Design a protein with these regions (language model features):
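Amphipathic alpha-helical interaction segments
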Residues: 99-100, 235, 259, 416
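N-terminal export/targeting leaders of redox proteins
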Residues: 1-75, 130, 248-418
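A contiguous, surface-exposed recognition patch within enzymatic or periplasmic domains that forms
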Residues: 200, 208-241, 245-265, 283
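Sequence context of c-type cytochrome heme-c attachment sites
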Residues: 7, 15-196, 203-204, 210-233
Length: 418
């Protein structure tokens, strides 16, 4: 128990020429080590499929089959949504559709191409997306012609699109069908594989390789290994079972107040010390997240115990703690790591003067900043903008605004003082 301290013609080397720009807050790093072309694949069927499916870099799709209609050939998520209506709606409102937003784009204007290429491995991994980004930013190796009809011109800004996970060489892949499928399906049907229901599929982008960046001896992103070491992981409860329940393409996590609240079990106990003093103790247990709460170095969660009068007005903070792994803005030093492992309990408590009268209570509040590290980093960058273009500053300000507006607050418990 923890006591809290208070396109086809584009070659695979498209984004390899350096531009010499400065790289600021580089958090992205491709996940588990991926094979390069010509390297032997693992013998385990899941590992073998994933190694081929996520070969680095992904090759262009190539020309679509002649019999494909424009909708069947298109890489646009909107085209997929013509038939996969619910999946498209879920994706459209998810964070996966925003992985190539202002928070990434302002940095691309300062990065060299190899660094940006590393980010796009997970944020916008298709070769066609890289080509469009190169066109937009004027990078070396950008295609000289317009994209083919099956590549929408905004594909690079749509983030982790359907095709990033489900399409290779215009062939569709997905989990095994739950019910029998029709004899004739659009886009020549699909190839089922169990890898889509295995946590290793998610590890491709949610687990840094052993050679990845470490702070205080710990990988910067270690979500898959945190899960593997947890009771849910050992029991075979996959990432998809929580974050894609019933195959919904929602991927809810720390940004979602309901999902975050469900990850915790809390109790609040009051003890009378004497006629004038009382003690409150809150126990907060990570019972629902199969990884650290929170995972990664970006989010921060602040818990507070508050004295509240009969009218519901706060009358004093009794105790506060931050649950997070905090690093400095340039990611060279871990400042602290107070996160809860799966199944771990933290205790927050303090003494207070017993109020007179009835109707007083103690409330346990949770304030979540899903992008806390980004907020600090982006604010720091805004203080050093002399080398930035006007458009870069605009994107940076929008990225900061988005990070700040993602915050939320939840009352987890209310205990009446008797």
């Amino acid at each position: 128990m923890k006591k809290f301290a208070v396109w086809t013609a584009v070659g695979v080397g498209l984004l390899m020429a350096a531009s010499g720009a400065h790289n600021f807050f580089h958090l992205s790093e491709h996940g588990q080590d991926r094979p390069v072309s010509g390297q032997a694949l693992p013998t385990d069927p899941i590992d073998g499929f994933l190694a081929a499916h996520w070969i680095d870099p992904l090759p262009p799709q190539g020309a679509p089959p002649a019999q494909f209609s424009p909708i069947e050939a298109s890489l646009a998520p909107e085209a997929c949504g013509q038939c996969h209506v619910q999946q498209y709606r879920d994706w459209r409102d998810s964070l996966h559709s925003r992985t190539a937003g202002p928070g990434l784009l302002w940095q691309f204007r300062l990065m060299d191409q190899p660094a940006a290429n590393g980010c796009m491995r997970c944020h916008a991994p298709l070769a066609e997306q890289k080509a469009l980004m190169a066109l937009e930013l004027g990078w070396t190796g950008a295609p000289s012609s317009s994209p083919p009809s099956y590549v929408p011109t905004n594909l690079h800004r749509q983030g982790l699109v359907c095709a990033a996970c489900h399409v290779r060489a215009h062939r569709r892949f997905g989990p095994p069908a739950r019910t029998p499928t029709a004899d004739r399906l659009p886009h020549a049907g699909f190839s089922p594989h169990a890898a889509f229901e295995d946590s290793r599929f998610c590890a491709v982008c949610h687990q840094f390789p052993e050679s990845g960046t470490r702070l205080n001896g710990k990988l910067l992103e270690n979500t898959y290994e945190e899960w593997r070491a947890s009771r849910p992981g050992r029991a075979g409860q996959t990432c998809q079972s929580c974050h894609m329940s019933d195959r919904r393409h929602l991927w809810r996590g720390i940004h979602d107040s309901e999902m975050t609240t469900r990850a915790l079990t809390v109790t609040v106990d009051l003890t009378v010390l004497d006629r004038e003093r009382m003690r409150v103790e809150a126990k907060i247990t990570n019972t629902g997240a199969g990884h650290y709460f929170p995972t990664y170095v970006v989010p921060e969660v602040v818990f507070t115990l508050q004295l509240v009068d009969p009218a519901g007005r706060p009358k004093g903070e009794i105790a506060r703690t931050i649950i997070a792994r905090r690093a400095n803005v340039d990611l060279t030093q871990e400042l602290f790591d107070h996160r809860l492992r799966s199944g771990e309990t933290g205790i927050l408590g303090g003494q207070f003067k017993r109020p007179a009268g009835t109707g007083w209570s103690i409330e346990l509040h949770m304030a979540v900043s899903p992008g806390a590290h980004y907020e600090r980093s982006f604010q720091y960058a805004l203080e050093h903008t002399a080398h930035m273009t006007r458009d870069t500053r605009r994107l940076l300000r929008e990225a900061l605004r988005q990070a700040e507006t993602a915050r939320y607050r939840v009352t987890l418990a209310r205990t009446v003082i008797h």
